[in-house]
Amino acid sequence: METSTNQINISLNNNTFPNHMLYKQYKDSGTSSALILPAVMMNVAGIPGIAANLLLIFVTIQNNKLRGSANYLLALTAFFEILHQSAHFLFLFITVSGINFINYSTALKFQLHSIFGLTAAQTSMASIAADRLLSVLFPLKYYKLNIRLYFTIHIILAFISGIWMSINAINFSNKYPTLPVTGYISDLLVLDMEIIFPFIMLLCGINILLYFFVWIVQIMMEVLIQKPQSRLLKSLILIVSIVIGGYVIGCLCKIIIDHFLNLNDIQIWTVNQFAGILINIGASAETPILYIFSSFYREAINKQLRSIFYKRTNSKM
């Protein structure tokens, strides 16, 4: 532990460690708008997303019409995105309190679940794409699947990817336990942990490719899809365009900013916040898109919201 601390101190002194200028600038500055504003922006994007994803999970559980495999996988993705976006609470607390920096190992205790969720959400999105491809390639066999076994397989795949990335984070934390970070989740994804970005890009590419195949199969084979399923597919394609688009643009921006632009690390850290906001907008888009473009989801969400507000109104009377 002492050796690792000494290595970090030497690296900081030699200006070679991630965000070393940011650390020197703000480690003893107390509360600073330069840190608080990004934390607030992340939570402004993230908190509505958490609420929307919770609502999606709840209506999926409550509504008997939302019992298809795609519906379950959408709810699963929403759950993982909640884990991901909850990371921003620590960032806000650290900056508003004026602490500004904590050790990597400490941050990981509060944000390991978010790294798990971030990775698993992408795997779950790929599962949805694979599910849609199966539904158009083998429609008769698809509707005879054992839904519990089928869904369990997708859950296991998502958990495996999330656990794998979590193990990488734990190993990195053991290697550099006292690395100072702001509590922003992207600060945990440095050096060895940058492996998460090509992994996310790979899954995004798989998503796009699978939906492209879905489109091709529908055109070439003229597969007939029931209207509700067709509307769901259109919603899913739009979700992929926005959600995956947010992740792709965010990851590409981070890679370009970190490795190709001649900026100091304070400027890099600040600009990267905008990439993070894009990712969070994408992570929050699932429920609004389903509400707008799927009549089943819109009906279920409206019913649930009326129920919530009706109960609150009665409780006040």
Give the location of each predicted region.
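Seven-transmembrane-like multi-pass membrane architecture, highlighting hydrophobic TM helices
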Residues: 1-317
